[in-house]
Amino acid sequence: MYLKKINLKNKTALVTGAGKGIGMACAIALAEAGANLIIISRTQKDLDKVAKIIQKFKSKCITYACDVTNYTQVKNFINKQKKIDILVNNAG
């Protein structure tokens, strides 16, 4: 991937809709570039599969099953986060 040329070590990336498709591909590419990931999807099972791939790149990965159309779930998630350097808004 082209992101291998970019050093994202010590950066945290949040990817919504990361359980499948484009979101999953973005999360993996960011992990290849050295970023730590926070991945969100509605289904924990999908997140677990993606997290396993991300961990092969020695990146930390936090998963959060969340429906981004649910205000309460999103608010609870936001209150737990301290630092996000990169946002990929892919859900929906």
Residue ranges and their predicted role:
Residues 30:
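Aromatic pocket-lining residues of Rossmann-like dinucleotide-binding sites
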Residues 45, 64-76:
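The beta1-alpha1 cofactor-binding region of Rossmann-like NAD(H)/NADP(H)-dependent oxidoreductases
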Residues 12, 17-21:
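Conserved glycine-rich cofactor-binding loop
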Residues 1-11:
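Flexible N-terminal pre-Rossmann segment of NAD(P)-dependent oxidoreductases
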Residues 35-49:
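Conserved glycine-rich Rossmann-like NAD(P)H-binding loop of the short-chain dehydrogenase/reductase
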Residues 12, 36, 60-62, 83-85:
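Structural signature of beta-strand start/N-cap positions in the alpha/beta core
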Residues 16, 84-92:
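Rossmann-fold scaffold of SDR-type NAD(P)-dependent oxidoreductases
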